[in-house]
């Protein structure tokens, strides 16, 4: 007997949307203890279908037909009070963007404790103890410090782990995981996948796992659903769908998966450094709240040095909290380093101010990790893409034309110009962020997890686009990523960071296939779907 049954579900979009339905004719069952993966491009209806199960659809989006049956009840017919009782306790969800889902004004421990309080479970001291245990289970380093921290004080991967801890707090019957490992490094991702597998086995918990990572699908899925523009186009056992796909769309998605065996070409042209980093250091002081709080010193970046050459792409990889993103922010002067030099064109940007720094920032643009927090929620896409151009002297009409061109380059329709960031899926918002970074035609791009929120087909398009721009404009890129397959596809060299320091650097093929350090080997061993990749290459089973 099915634990959850969805039949003939139609979810209507508001008038004026690019299509009539977010999801159309959706039908599937979920059994106790089963892991069902839903894959598809951004905007395919994956998240909308999951939100309908939770009763969390946007106000303007309505289920207009069908039924969602759980424990003998049609969820679509329940009152809000009944849904509040159901959410968290029986069905729980891990959201895609933790920074927007977590309360920025509450400490992590209070947010986890709030889950128990809302359902009348545990005494206050027990809630604190259970919160610590949950943070340990999801791999948060130093849970005692993390429980007192605010979300902004944690890395992107650590914030996602907090969200997972909250979702698992009440040990639900069904866990809906919407891209839960997108922001996680490979070792933490492996820990979370193992944790979800353990809970499935020990408690019979069922999981709906929404992802664009086919390696993850191969490692955990019992069954797979493939969605395209709101409809299910293929469903079946994981090995059947992944190795013997029937639908052309599924075959196209699988063909776009980056492989460790696909290496970037060696950079051509001169070897002139366009960016030189020498002895970069950055320390943060966290904690110390209240009269007796003890501050904690974190050396986020320790003596980092490297050169980035014209036309070269360097990948920076490592676990969450290794200092990857902090390096990127120091280079752009979004935060100031404590020591070291950052040389662009022979000039140290640490000594620049005013017009000189402004001019250098035009040459060096950043693509951020979390598009929801880096895009102005009150600005239409047209303003987001044109304000930088206009600030540097481009006429409004020319800037608007450039914005339309940029949207096409990143795979979005020009009609997106008139919409706000909240009207897009997570992957679509990331594409807008990439378009904004490309607007001023910089010579250096710092991409902080720039494709982590994208499905494989759009990811492949964006990587191809960046490679094309690199060749055409002699563009140099610093590519911060936790996805070693993406690094294999686009990077000429790889820097491996651990606890703020560089532990290995070398050509991509050397680092990925003959690493010098045990730490790099541990990252490689944790990559999901390696057996699947070998099976694809050999044409066999996994």
Language model region names:
Residues 63-74, 340-348, 402:
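Conserved ABC transporter NBD signature motif
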Residues 169-173, 439-443, 459:
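A short, proline-enriched helix->beta-strand linker immediately N-terminal to the Walker B motif
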Residues 232-236, 244, 505-506:
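ABC ATPase "signature
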């Amino acid at each position: 007997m099915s634990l959850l049954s969805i039949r003939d579900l139609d979810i209507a979009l508001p008038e004026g949307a690019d299509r009539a339905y977010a999801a159309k004719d959706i039908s599937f069952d979920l059994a106790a203890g089963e892991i069902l993966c839903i894959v598809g491009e951004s905007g395919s209806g994956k998240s909308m279908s999951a939100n309908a199960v939770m009763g969390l659809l946007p106000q303007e989006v309505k289920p207009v037909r069908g039924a969602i049956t759980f424990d003998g009840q049609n969820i679509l017919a329940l009152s809000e009070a009944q849904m509040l009782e159901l959410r968290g306790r029986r069905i729980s969800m891990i959201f895609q963007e933790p920074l927007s889902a977590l309360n920025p004004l509450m400490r992590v421990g209070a947010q986890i404790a709030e889950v128990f309080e809302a359902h009348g479970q545990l005494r206050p001291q027990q809630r604190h103890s259970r919160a610590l245990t949950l943070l340990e289970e999801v791999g948060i380093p130093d849970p005692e410090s993390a429980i007192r921290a605010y979300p902004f004080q944690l890395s992107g991967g650590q914030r996602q782990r907090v969200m997972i801890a909250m979702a698992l707090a009440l040990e639900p019957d069904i866990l809906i995981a919407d891209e839960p490992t997108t922001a996680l490094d490979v070792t933490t991702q492996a820990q979370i996948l193992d944790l979800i597998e353990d809970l499935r086995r020990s408690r019979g918990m069922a999981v709906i796992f929404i992802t664009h990572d086919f390696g993850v699908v191969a490692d955990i899925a019992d069954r797979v659903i493939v969605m395209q523009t709101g409809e299910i186009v293929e469903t079946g056992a994981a090995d059947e769908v992944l190795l013997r796909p029937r639908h052309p769309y599924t075959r196209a998605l699988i063909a776009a998966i980056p492989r460790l065996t696909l290496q970037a070409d060696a950079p051509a042209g001169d070897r002139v450094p366009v960016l030189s980093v020498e002895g970069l250091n950055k320390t943060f002081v966290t904690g110390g709240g209240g009269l007796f709080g003890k501050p904690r010193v974190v050396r986020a970046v320790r003596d980092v040095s490297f050169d980035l050459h014209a036309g070269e792409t360097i990948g920076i990889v490592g676990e969450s909290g290794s200092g990857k993103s902090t390096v990127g922010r120091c280079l752009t002067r979004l935060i100031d380093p404590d020591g070291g030099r950052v040389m662009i064109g022979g000039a140290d940007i640490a000594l620049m101010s005013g017009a000189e720094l402004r001019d250098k920032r035009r040459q060096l643009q950043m693509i951020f990790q979390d598009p929801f927090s880096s895009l102005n929620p009150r600005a239409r896409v047209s303003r987001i893409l044109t304000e930088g151009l206009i600030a540097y002297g481009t006429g409004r009409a020319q800037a608007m034309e450039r914005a339309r061109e940029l949207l096409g380059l990143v795979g979005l329709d020009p009609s997106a110009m008139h919409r706000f960031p909240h009207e897009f899926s997570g992957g679509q918002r990331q594409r807008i962020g990439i378009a904004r970074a490309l607007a001023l035609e910089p010579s250096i791009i710092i991409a902080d997890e720039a494709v982590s929120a994208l499905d494989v087909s759009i990811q492949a398009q964006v990587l191809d686009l960046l490679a094309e721009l690199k060749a055409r404009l002699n563009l140099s890129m610093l590519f911060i990523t936790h996805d070693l397959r993406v690094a294999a596809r686009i990077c000429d060299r790889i820097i491996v960071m651990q606890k703020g320091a560089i532990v290995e650097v070398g050509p991509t093929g050397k680092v990925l296939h003959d690493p010098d350090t045990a730490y790099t080997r541990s990252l490689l061993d944790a990559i999901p779907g390696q057996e699947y990749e070998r099976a694809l290459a050999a044409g066999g089973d996994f």
